[in-house]
Design a protein with these regions (language model features):
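Short beta-strand segments
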Residues: 24-26, 50, 126, 172-173, ...
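Active-site glycine- and acidic-residue-rich loops that bind
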Residues: 27, 101-106, 177-180
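A short acidic, amphipathic alpha-helical/loop segment
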Residues: 34-37, 110, 184-187
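Structural motif
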Residues: 21, 122, 168-170
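Solvent-exposed alpha-helices and their adjacent loops that cap or buttress functional pockets
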Residues: 13-18, 38-41, 113-117, 136, ...
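Glycine-rich, acidic loop regions that bind phosphate or pyrophosphate groups
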Residues: 1-87
Length: 200
């Protein structure tokens, strides 16, 4: 699962926040992952590796590339049996057409239903509800920003996905972000791009 503090799945939140030692490999501490923590996660009980350095508690060791660290750790645990088994996530599906207002969960259900009928499509999500909704969508290629300061990312990112891959993307974008960059859709006609844009 994905840790999102009190906004995430309770069992994931409990696992992370009650851990005696967190291993954070390539994790960028931001408002979308640790900003809604109910408990304070302290560097004293974490080993963090990113940006070419490793921090253990309050100590920092530079010039340790993440790829080299992971390769060395994999080599040291080779042949050991994992103590815990993961479980397959259950993504919401089966959208019911009714008179109730549309919620982000309904959007995730609709996209998951579409994927089951037509196959997976790449996904570009903006920040906020769009990003959190994307976490309830079946695993597919996803581009999304990590900070609220990147509002407006979704539409241009979706166009970039189609330009780079030739595949039709789904874009999840909020109404404010759409006002900022939605006009970029005017560039779709000459190259023949056809993203599906869902405005929250």
């Amino acid at each position: 699962g994905t840790y999102m503090g009190i906004a995430g799945q309770p069992e994931i939140t409990q696992l992370v926040e009650e851990s005696d030692c967190l291993l954070l490999f390539g994790v960028i501490l931001s408002d979308t992952n640790f900003g809604v923590s109910e408990k304070r996660i302290t560097p004293r009980t974490a080993i963090s590796a990113h940006g070419g350095a490793v921090a253990l508690g309050w100590h920092r060791y530079g010039r340790i590339p993440l790829a080299a660290l992971v390769a060395e750790l994999n080599q040291r645990v080779a042949g050991r049996t994992p103590q815990a088994e993961g479980r397959e996530p259950r993504y919401p599906q089966g959208l019911v057409m009714d008179e109730a207002p549309v919620t982000p969960g309904d959007i995730a259900r609709a996209v998951n239903d579409l994927f089951r009928r037509s196959g997976r499509m790449p996904l570009a999500a903006d920040v906020g509800d769009c990003l959190f909704t994307a976490l309830d969508i079946e695993n597919t290629e996803l581009v999304a920003p990590g900070y609220y300061a990147t509002m407006g990312f979704g539409v241009p990112a979706g166009l970039g996905v189609q330009a780079a891959t030739g595949r039709r993307p789904i874009v999840l974008v909020g109404d404010g972000a759409f006002q900022m960059t939605g006009w970029e859709l005017g560039n779709c006609r000459p190259p023949g791009w056809d993203p599906i844009v869902v405005v929250f």
